[in-house]
């Protein structure tokens, strides 16, 4: 029973890390798409839009990193 629980923990950690990476990729893709649409509509606001896009993408990457760290902690602790 203990060996089965350990393997399920490994599977769960791997699935969790994968889902976090996939979700971050989708989120950053949507941010990039929306930013390009906004820049096409308002070219004079390019610098503000680009800055906001980079900040939001960094926040998403931070959340994804925390999710992967939690999955790794679940795997090894």
Regions found by a protein language model. Give the residues of each.
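Hydrophobic, small-residue-rich transmembrane alpha-helices and their short perimembrane loops
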Residues: 1-77
């Amino acid at each position: 029973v203990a060996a089965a629980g350990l393997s399920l923990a490994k599977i769960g950690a791997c699935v969790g890390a994968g889902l976090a990476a996939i979700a971050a990729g989708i989120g950053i893709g949507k941010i990039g798409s929306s930013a390009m649409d906004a820049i096409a509509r308002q070219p004079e606001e390019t610098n503000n839009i680009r800055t906001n896009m980079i900040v939001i993408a960094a926040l998403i990457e931070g959340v994804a990193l925390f999710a992967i760290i939690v999955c790794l902690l679940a795997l090894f602790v």
